């Protein structure tokens, strides 16, 4: 027997799987985040022989959503749990634990959800993990597997799932960090362009800072366009935001 009661060949298989997933994760880091996560859970999930569907759940701002899945059925299974506010994928995320059931219809805590999952999607077995992200200040996440077979997931599958969950957590963390950096850059870029546009209008029309900003805001309202977009054009071309003079600016 090997460590934790596993045979040495089981341990070697887990190590081989971990090495393979590490290489795959490195390859996927620069792909589109959604596609990368789908590839990871699709290929990694093949290690769990009886797993029919897999998905990744995130909870942000009090709202659950699925950011990657291997099939529309997986999305439906998640969505039904979100509607109930319970189920393996929801509870694993909220309670920071793993949930395994060999027959979701027999679980008292998830009635009548279990019957609904079985009737709508044929689901019987479910396995869900909380993903431990590098930054959980705004988002937490989980990895979910489901099967149409009873008692589908073996102890070895549970260990394989833990290995996959580790790599999914890294990839989700990288994706969220990229999104955060992108949003921060966009915000900084917008603020910079608004500042430049305000300066241009102040110089061209001898306006105060507040009057110049009001001109941009008024143009945004009248043209139904984002203020940042109008500011970008003014900053780039030096043109007025629309064809009326500074006398139209509310002076207060």
Spans of features found by a protein language model:
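Regulatory sensory and allosteric helical modules in signal-transduction proteins
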Residues: 58-59, 74-111, 115-119, 124
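Interdomain signal-transducing alpha-helices
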Residues: 44, 92, 117, 135, ...
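A short, aliphatic-rich beta-strand micro-motif
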Residues: 124-134
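Regulatory loop-to-helix N-cap segments in sensory/regulatory domains
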Residues: 2-6, 146-161
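The cytosolic transmitter module of two-component sensor histidine kinases
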Residues: 17, 33-37, 85, 157, ...
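Short glycine-/small-residue motifs
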Residues: 139-143
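Intrinsically disordered, low-complexity terminal regulatory regions
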Residues: 1-72, 234-252
């Amino acid at each position: 027997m090997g460590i934790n009661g596993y045979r040495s060949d089981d341990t070697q298989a887990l190590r081989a799987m971990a090495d393979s997933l590490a290489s795959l994760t490195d390859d996927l880091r620069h792909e589109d985040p959604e596609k990368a996560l789908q590839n990871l859970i699709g290929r990694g999930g093949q290690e769990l022989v009886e797993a029919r569907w897999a998905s990744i759940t995130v909870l942000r701002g009090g709202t659950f959503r699925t950011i990657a899945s291997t099939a529309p059925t997986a999305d439906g299974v998640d969505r039904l749990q979100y509607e109930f506010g319970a189920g393996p994928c929801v509870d694993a995320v909220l309670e920071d634990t793993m949930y395994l059931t060999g027959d979701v219809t027999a679980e008292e805590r998830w009635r009548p959800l279990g019957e609904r999952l079985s009737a709508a999607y044929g689901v019987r077995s479910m396995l869900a993990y909380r993903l431990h992200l590098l930054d959980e200040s705004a988002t937490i996440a989980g990895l979910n597997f489901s099967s149409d077979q009873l008692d589908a997931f073996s102890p070895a599958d549970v260990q394989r799932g833990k290995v996959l969950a580790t790599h999914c957590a890294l990839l989700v963390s990288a994706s969220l960090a990229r999104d955060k950096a992108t949003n921060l850059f966009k915000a900084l870029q917008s603020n910079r362009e608004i500042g430049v546009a305000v300066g241009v209008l102040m110089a061209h029309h001898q306006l105060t800072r507040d009057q110049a900003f009001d001109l941009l805001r008024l143009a945004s309202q009248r043209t139904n366009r984002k203020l940042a977009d109008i500011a970008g054009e003014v900053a780039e071309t030096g043109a007025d935001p629309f064809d009326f003079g500074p006398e139209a600016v509310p002076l207060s």
